[in-house]
Amino acid sequence: MGKEIEGIVQIGSKPVVERHATATGLLHLSPVTVAAIQEKSVKKGDVLEASTIAAIQAVKDTPRIIPHCHPIPLEGCNVTWDWEGHALRCTVLVSAHYKTGIEMEALTGVCAGLLCALDMVKSLEKDGSGQYPGTSITDVVVVEKFKGTV
């Protein structure tokens, strides 16, 4: 079918440099759900607190989830949440000194944070048929990638 997987990319000869990556994404929700999150009345608990923990854990577990990612000794991870109308924005900043980039860690953190938030509020988002017509995760993107010099 195509080229077989040979393993992860060899980075042994690359220098260790400062690295930062920031990713972001949106979870679009109903006004009722937004109010429940803001009032901290969601049955499963504090959505932003639990979703922050999920994002941090996902950042640390990226090489276990994405086969070609190297295990990177992370130095920092910051998760922030902002409201944009009825959309919840998750932004994850990851930092390290290493031989390869860390944008996949930032993206994985955003996705896990948003998925956790959705899981916690899905009972509020369902319509009469059990579907989620107004709920979506969108605009997941790396907004900044920094690579220092040797």
Language model: regions and residue ranges:
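C-terminal binding/interaction regions
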Residues: 1-43, 53-56, 60-70, 75-150
